[in-house]
């Protein structure tokens, strides 16, 4: 019977990252995936590695450390895999959407806020307005989210990890006196020491809606257009963004829909995304819609204690 230090349920970006760094630290890893790696949001996300704009110092430290790991993997992934994550360094222009956001950002970024539309239009001529100002970040990267997820997974496999296709249920785990002992499928049994359920918005459902796992699904839709127009920067405002990716398509998003697991793209979302984009930009008269995607990401459930 095979023995593993860690069972990982789900091979999205979190599961694949965990598999990579665990394997790198000489842990024996078993990954269980129901579909294929990058099946949902981990393979369809915009892939922007944007700066942390909040005020929580611990969250900022975590973000900074994560960004450093991205920079490291960008330089070293070829040591582990042939799957290129396609990191792309570019400039990010974040447009401040409200007076409240500006006040919040002033605490940490006041010195970087620029209110000069003419100056900003020299960088991105197609912008119509900058609302309450912008912050320009030169240290910014985008990545192909599908490739990154598969690059990390493939790296872990090349270091000895194993992946199996299985629709995991919590009943697949066996315990001995409340201590985790093994994981079983219909055909195999594996001895395991630890388990990590990294199934995004499905995590709570898999874990039998455990109250300690307070995640829920949030649907996001995005549009991909062919255009002859140059667009060298990544622009974000509110929850929305526009960026031209390495596939030479203009990616525009996004929605944040609290609709549980209601699947599918909608015309309403398409109109909403385009309206937001057209309010911000001029001179995109040749947009040709190539793709419209919808996927689920996870967000925290807000629990009120009465």
Model features per residue range: what roles?
Residues 2-14, 30:
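Beta1/beta-strand and adjacent pyrophosphate-binding region of the FAD-binding site
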């Amino acid at each position: 019977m095979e023995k593993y230090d860690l069972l990982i349920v789900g091979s999205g970006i979190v599961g694949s990252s965990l598999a990579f760094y665990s394997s790198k630290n000489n842990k024996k890893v078993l990954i269980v995936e129901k579909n294929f790696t990058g099946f949902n949001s981990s393979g369809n996300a915009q892939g922007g590695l944007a700066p942390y704009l909040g005020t929580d110092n611990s969250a900022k430290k975590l973000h900074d450390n994560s960004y450093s790991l991205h920079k490291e993997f960008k330089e070293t992934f070829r040591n582990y895999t042939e799957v290129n994550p396609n990191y792309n360094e570019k400039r990010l222009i974040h447009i401040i959407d409200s007076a409240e956001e500006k006040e919040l950002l002033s605490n940490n970024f006041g010195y970087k806020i620029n209110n000069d539309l003419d100056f900003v239009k020299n960088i991105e001529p197609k912008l119509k307005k900058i609302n309450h100002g912008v912050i320009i970040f030169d240290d910014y990267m985008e990545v192909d989210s599908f490739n990154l997820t598969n690059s990390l997974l493939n790296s872990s496999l090349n270091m000895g990890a194993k992946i199996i296709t299985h629709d995991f249920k919590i009943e697949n785990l066996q315990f001995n006196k409340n201590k985790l002992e093994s994981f079983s499928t219909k055909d195999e049994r594996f001895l395991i020491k630890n388990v990590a359920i990294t199934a995004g918005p499905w995590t709570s459902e898999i874990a039998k809606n455990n109250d300690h796992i307070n995640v829920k699904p949030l649907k996001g839709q995005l549009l991909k257009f062919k255009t002859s127009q140059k667009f060298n920067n990544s622009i974000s405002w509110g929850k929305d963004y526009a960026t031209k990716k390495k596939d030479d398509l203009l990616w525009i998003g996004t929605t944040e829909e609290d609709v549980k697991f209601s699947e599918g793209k909608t015309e309403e979302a398409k109109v909403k995304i385009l309206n937001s984009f057209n309010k911000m930009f001029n001179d995109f008269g040749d947009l040709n819609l190539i793709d419209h995607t919808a996927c689920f990401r996870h967000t925290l459930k807000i629990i009120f204690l009465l």
